[in-house]
């Protein structure tokens, strides 16, 4: 069989094979066999040395024509296959737009974040700035700057997670006060700040205790700040969070960084001050601690305590949420139970 007959036979067989192909994988295999570097047309070109010189040009021309024909048919067939595959996929995956839609499952804010966002907005409206301090704190800022030197017996009041040397997981957000006091320029303005954040204590987790909880520290420092200013501020906080009908009272207490120190109670939510098991028959529930800033705290930060004074308060956001929403177990905040969390969606606004 001469090359002309071989080209004619390859022409017929090649077109037939291309026509039978039903998928891209088969088509690619045919392309390699016909026009690839080691395909049939390439083999014919390699055998041109056996062709008479006067016929070589004609054979080469027919090989090129056949290659162009095969490539054109291969491309056309591939386009048809791709179109057919896409049409089938669209048919299989088509959407019936007349079907009813599925309602999306919306999340909600965590109850502690609801309290936090509400209080931050409240204090910003009263001219306070919000400060974020480090959770990994130094002994210097967490204790010493807050009038708790290394030999102070009040350190035993807080079981601390020490990391190494001077570094620890902060037991209170009071360190934020010291950092801001050091940098604040009192010649320009008074200092009014709140510092929310996570704090850590070496407590055994139970219904009322957690090794990690949220706290918010507040601080006001200026000339002529009095206990009356503190009392009025605390009453406004309590009534804002727990309702205007809540009665409040202050009791003497002790904190190393304030003098005098007080704790604030609100009338019991359950019995309205009459006495019940929840308030231990006192009619009152403790909500936060506060006091006038100790002169040592001011002096440690380089603030003249004979000119400036102020008040500070610290409240537990977890405790506020427990009291406001009537939650029995603090661990409910951290177990990620959607059934528990979604009931606070109505509180977000």
UniProtKB/Swiss-Prot annotation:
Its cofactor is Mg(2+). Its main location: cytoplasm. Its EC number is 6.1.1.20. One of its GO terms (biological process) is phenylalanyl-tRNA aminoacylation. Keywords: Aminoacyl-tRNA synthetase, ATP-binding, Cytoplasm, Ligase, Magnesium, Metal-binding, Nucleotide-binding, Protein biosynthesis. NCBIfam families: pheS (TIGR00468). Tetramer of two alpha and two beta subunits. This is Phenylalanine--tRNA ligase alpha subunit. It comes from Lactobacillus helveticus (strain DPC 4571). The lineage of its organism: Bacteria, Bacillati, Bacillota, Bacilli, Lactobacillales.
């Amino acid at each position: 069989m001469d090359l002309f007959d071989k080209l004619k036979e390859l022409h017929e067989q090649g077109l037939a094979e291309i026509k039978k192909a039903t998928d891209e994988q088969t088509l690619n295999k045919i392309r390699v066999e016909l026009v690839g570097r080691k395909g049939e047309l390439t083999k014919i070109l390699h055998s041109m040395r056996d062709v008479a010189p006067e016929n070589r040009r004609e054979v080469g021309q027919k090989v090129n024509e056949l290659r162009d024909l095969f490539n054109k048919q291969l491309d056309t067939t591939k386009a048809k296959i791709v179109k057919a595959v896409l049409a089938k996929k669209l048919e299989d995956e088509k959407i019936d737009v007349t079907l009813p839609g599925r309602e999306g499952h919306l999340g909600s804010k965590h109850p502690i974040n609801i309290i936090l966002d509400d209080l931050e907005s409240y204090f910003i409206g009263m001219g306070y700035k919000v400060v974020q301090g480090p959770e990994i704190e130094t002994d210097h800022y967490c204790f010493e700057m807050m009038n708790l030197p290394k030999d102070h017996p009040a350190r035993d009041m807080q079981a601390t997670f020490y990391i190494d040397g001077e570094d620890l997981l902060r037991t209170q957000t009071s360190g934020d006060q010291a950092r801001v006091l050091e940098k604040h320029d009192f010649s320009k303005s008074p200092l009014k700040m709140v510092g929310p954040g996570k704090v850590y204590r070496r407590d055994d987790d139970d219904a009322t205790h957690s090794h990690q909880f949220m706290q918010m520290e507040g601080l006001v420092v200026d000339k002529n700040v009095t206990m009356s200013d503190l009392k009025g501020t605390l009453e406004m906080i309590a009534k804002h969070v727990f309702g205007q009908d809540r009665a409040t009272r202050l009791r003497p207490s002790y904190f190393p960084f304030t003098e005098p120190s007080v704790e604030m109670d609100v009338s019991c939510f359950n019995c309205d001050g009459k006495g019940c098991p929840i308030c231990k028959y006192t009619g009152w529930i403790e909500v936060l601690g506060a006091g006038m800033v100790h002169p040592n705290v001011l002096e440690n930060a380089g603030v003249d305590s004979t000119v400036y004074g102020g008040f500070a308060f610290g409240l537990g956001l977890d405790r506020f949420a427990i009291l406001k929403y009537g939650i029995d177990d603090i661990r409910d905040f951290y177990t990620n139970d959607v059934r528990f969390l979604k009931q606070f969606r109505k509180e977000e606004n």
